[in-house]
């Protein structure tokens, strides 16, 4: 799971 600032990798 790679959640940065947006909602990628959810």
UniProtKB/Swiss-Prot annotation:
Subcellular location: Secreted
Keyword Secreted: yes
Superkingdom of the source species: Eukaryota
Modified residues (Pyrrolidone carboxylic acid): 1
GO BP term, pick one: neuropeptide signaling pathway
The protein's role, per its UniProt record: Hypertrehalosaemic factors are neuropeptides that elevate the level of trehalose in the hemolymph (trehalose is the major carbohydrate in the hemolymph of insects).
Name of the protein in its database record: Hypertrehalosaemic hormone
